């Protein structure tokens, strides 16, 4: 090895490592759309996504490998009483693992509806099934989220304060640092975020979310 090559090699070894910014993204149903309003990260969430219909599998192919993915999923299954989800859950977990994603599963939240009992049952099923699977499961079925001051008029979705509460809980469970704006607690910002979502896409998601809330066919 020449003296010049040796110097180059030593310089590479001695160079300090550069920290790579971690990527955070949101997938899942329209509750996930709302959570993204608070998180302000790239989102692939959309209306009517459920465990049983498998649409989230395509969403999980979108984030970059190694990203931390916050996935809101289960509400559209609870509304119809679809509780036999073991096979679909295993497929979701394996898809995330194949993409080397760190999956943070945000469970179905408490709802102001008669089918809230299904929410509780599905939440328990998911917590049990995901144990030891390398997934961070964040329960949202507790009564504190049924506070009407946090909810939209349909009793299923949330207002900005509610989505912020959910995001704060999910971020804390995942160990993701958030900073609350000084003037309001409704706009948390994640450090080192790979922001790719445009204002236009944000507006389109907002319109679609509101339309789904008013139609009342599928909760999200």
Name the predicted role of every residue range.
Residues 93-97:
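Surface-exposed amphipathic alpha-helices with a cationic face
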Residues 1-2:
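N-terminal secretory signal peptides that target proteins for export/translocation
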Residues 17-21:
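Sec/Tat signal peptide C-region and signal peptidase I cleavage site
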Residues 98-102:
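A short helix->loop->beta-strand "cap" motif at the edges of active sites that frequently abuts
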Residues 111-220:
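Catalytic His-Asp segment of secreted/periplasmic serine-dependent ester chemistry enzymes
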Residues 72, 106-107:
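Alpha/beta-hydrolase-fold catalytic nucleophile elbow
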Residues 22-91, 112-120:
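Conserved SGNH/GDSL esterase-like catalytic core that processes O-acyl groups on lipids
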Residues 5-16:
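Bacterial N-terminal signal peptides
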């Amino acid at each position: 090895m020449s003296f010049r090559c040796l110097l180059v090699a030593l310089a590479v070894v001695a160079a300090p490592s550069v920290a790579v910014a971690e990527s955070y993204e949101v997938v899942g149903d329209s509750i996930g759309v709302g959570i993204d309003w608070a998180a302000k990260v790239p989102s692939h969430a959309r209306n009517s996504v459920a465990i049983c219909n498998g649409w989230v599998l395509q969403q999980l192919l979108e984030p970059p490998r190694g990203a931390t993915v916050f996935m809101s999923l289960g509400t559209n299954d609870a509304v119809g009483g679809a509780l036999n989800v073991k096979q679909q859950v295993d497929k979701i977990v394996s898809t995330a693992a194949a993409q080397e994603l760190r999956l943070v599963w945000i469970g179905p939240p408490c709802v102001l509806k008669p089918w809230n009992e299904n929410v509780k049952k599905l939440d328990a099923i998911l917590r049990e099934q995901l144990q030891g699977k390398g997934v961070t499961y964040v329960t949202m079925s507790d009564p504190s989220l049924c506070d009407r001051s946090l909810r939209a008029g349909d009793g299923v979705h949330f207002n900005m304060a509610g989505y912020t509460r959910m995001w704060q809980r999910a971020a804390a469970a995942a160990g993701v640092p958030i900073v609350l704006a000084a003037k309001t607690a409704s706009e948390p910002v994640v450090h080192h975020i790979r922001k790719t979502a445009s204002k236009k896409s944000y507006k389109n998601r907002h319109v679609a979310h509101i339309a789904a809330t008013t139609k009342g066919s599928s909760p999200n």
